[in-house]
């Protein structure tokens, strides 16, 4: 219950800073996860930093993330200076898709900001389905 209310608050803050609802939701989930696992340095304490970076145009809140297929197993994600959570989410989804087809998925990310707790992506629900 608390985390759903907290998610709504964080999501609304990110939306105020011009992130799409989807990108705000992805970002809020990652911040809350960091708090729930005790990695506070990657959680809510960073919210102001992300908002400041958006205000200073270091993070592009309207970034169009591009995925370049290198092979059936390998891809590059260009985050276009997006908030890192969204680029990382795109990367893990791309890696999973590639792995389902070929048995391995390797994705590199560039032009992206801080993406929080890396273990969040390694332990994602999507990855557990592979």
What is the role of each PLM region?
Residues 21-32:
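Short, well-structured alpha-helical segments
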Residues 15, 100, 126:
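Short polybasic/polar patches that bind polyanions
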Residues 43-96:
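Active-site cofactor/substrate anionic-group-binding motifs, chiefly glycine-
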């Amino acid at each position: 219950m608390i985390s759903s209310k907290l998610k709504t608050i964080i999501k609304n803050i990110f939306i105020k800073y011009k992130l799409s609802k989807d990108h705000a939701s992805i970002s809020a989930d990652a911040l809350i996860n960091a708090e729930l696992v005790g990695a506070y340095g990657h959680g809510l304490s960073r919210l102001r930093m992300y908002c400041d970076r958006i205000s200073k145009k270091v993070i592009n809140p309207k970034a169009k993330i591009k995925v370049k297929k290198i092979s059936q197993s390998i891809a590059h994600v260009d985050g276009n200076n997006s908030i890192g959570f969204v680029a990382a989410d795109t990367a893990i989804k791309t890696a999973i898709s590639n792995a389902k087809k070929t048995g391995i998925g390797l994705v590199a990310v560039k032009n992206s900001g801080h993406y929080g707790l890396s273990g969040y992506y390694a332990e994602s629900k999507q990855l557990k389905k592979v």
